[in-house]
Amino acid sequence: MAEHLMSDVPFWQSKTLDEMSDAEWESLCDGCGQCCLHKLMDEDTDEIYFTNVACRQLNIKTCQCRNYERRFEFEPDCIKLTRENLPTFEWLPMTCAYRLLAEGKDLPAWHPLLTGSKAAMHGERISVRHIAVKESEVIDWQDHILNKPDWAQ
């Protein structure tokens, strides 16, 4: 009986991030696309500024990488989030499952692992579908900074 009850507990509640299989780890990604928006770094302060400019490999409508398996060939600067480097990514969105679980929190109600699809996430406007622009359309990157410093507001 106890064994049956254990199987009803979702893996993200019964395992640490380190204990998860690669498939479980990958499934935590809600596919919001926020990681795939370009970030700019202030050369003087190292502060990170978020833009609404999508990576060339991001399909803005689906919020999925066009070449996920080969993304590093197409985009050498693409960032690979791993169990080891997770603590160094302070910029991850507050809604990111990796961040939430690392902080001992649960997945949000709209997460695709709970709802079975990305529809609720898109409905909550968590994904970049509603704000992202194509890199090829950008003239002045600074016009696309979302979290401008006080002096630039």
Swiss-Prot record:
Q: Which domain of life is it from?
A: Bacteria
Question: Coiled-coil ranges per the record?
Answer: none
Q: Which family does it belong to?
A: Belongs to the UPF0260 family.
- Put simply, this protein is called UPF0260 protein YcgN
In its UniProt entry, the species of origin is given as Escherichia coli O139:H28 (strain E24377A / ETEC)
